[in-house]
Amino acid sequence: MAKRAEPLPDPACAASDIGQQIVRWLTHLRAERRLSPKTLEAYARDVRQCLMFLGQHWSEQVTLEGFVALEPADIRSFMAARRADDIGGRSLMRSLAGLRSFARFLEREGLGKVGALGAIRAPKVGKSVPKPIHMSAAKRFADASERAGEDREPWIWARDAAVMALLYGSGLRISEALGLKRRDVPPPGAGDVLVVTGKGNKTRMVPVLQNVLALIHEYVAMCPHSLPPEGPIFVGARGGPLRARIIQLVMARMRGALGLPDSATPHALRHSFATHLLSRGGDLRAIQELLGHASLSTTQIYTGIDSERLLDVYRTAHPRA
């Protein structure tokens, strides 16, 4: 299927020469940098919003030449306008990152250097502390019997329990768990490591507890749909790929029954995995590897070690071990 073309900026505020370079830049990010579709969409939106602001600010179309000649005051005015629209610090940081990425692309292509962006400091952003779910409650999310009163087929209970067990038991992102193929999960007695594809299509080895594997195999045995080796292991009621929204809704219903706050989400199970490992003596760098964080600073909000060390830390520290 052909890839969707990125929308050009509004021609009322931006000339065709800069619009064409934006399309080339986004194509480069997709093909060479392998950024996620959501990141590409956000970057494209941020740059378009900047061009719309500049077009109104200058009362003329923004050309490539005009963009290269930006003054620091122009960027500060754009950021101030975004703040006035109640845009938060993290979104402003992303906007600035997108503009800088586009500027670097123009410079590499020999189209000029946007010096104004180098004079702008990134907005300060307070670090948000993840809210882990209590250990006993986190385990209950992976217990299919907690949903015994629901009018659902037992295989769906088993499926949801297996997914949530992976989020808490192996610290996977919801996209990583739902992206697993049947062949990615070892059959009974054939190992306890998953090869997970994370952000940027990077793969990592992730240990998986035997009781989590047992839940996955129980679901597979109960599933009425065909699960070919190259297809997704987790499927929806009609046999298609399972959507993250389904698991989010399941957790929303369960957290109400368990008396948990709205912060008890699929991603909170991943946070809980890291927090509970760390509280039991897990090594910070080992947890970084398990989570697939590119930078230790990301892990330090709560979380090159060899695979045997990862397995040892995991088996020793995880509360489900």
From Swiss-Prot:
Chief place where the protein resides: cytoplasm
**Which Pfam family, an example, fits this chain?**
Phage_integrase
Matching entries from Gene3D superfamilies are given as:
1.10.150.130, Intergrase catalytic core
Domain of life according to the entry: Bacteria
Question: Does this UniProt record's set of keywords contain DNA-binding?
Answer: yes
Q: Where is the Core-binding (CB) domain?
A: 16-107
Q: Which GO terms describe its molecular function?
A: DNA binding; tyrosine-based site-specific recombinase activity
Annotated compartments: Cytoplasm
Q: Which residues form the active site?
A: R173, K199, H267, R270, H293, Y302 (o-(3'-phospho-dna)-tyrosine intermediate)
Q: Which GO terms describe its cellular component?
A: cytoplasm
Q: Which UniProt keywords apply?
A: Cell cycle, Cell division, Chromosome partition, Cytoplasm, DNA integration, DNA recombination, DNA-binding
- Could you list the residue ranges that cross the membrane? none
Q: Which GO terms describe its biological process?
A: cell division; chromosome segregation; DNA transposition
Domain Tyr recombinase residues, every copy: 128-315
Q: How does it assemble?
A: Forms a cyclic heterotetrameric complex composed of two molecules of XerC and two molecules of XerD.
Function statement: Site-specific tyrosine recombinase, which acts by catalyzing the cutting and rejoining of the recombining DNA molecules. The XerC-XerD complex is essential to convert dimers of the bacterial chromosome into monomers to permit their segregation at cell division. It also contributes to the segregational stability of plasmids.
Q: Which family does it belong to?
A: Belongs to the 'phage' integrase family. XerC subfamily.
Annotated protein name in UniProt:
Tyrosine recombinase XerC
What organism is listed for this UniProt entry? Nitrobacter winogradskyi (strain ATCC 25391 / DSM 10237 / CIP 104748 / NCIMB 11846 / Nb-255)
Instruction: Supply the source organism's classification.
Output: Bacteria, Pseudomonadati, Pseudomonadota, Alphaproteobacteria, Hyphomicrobiales
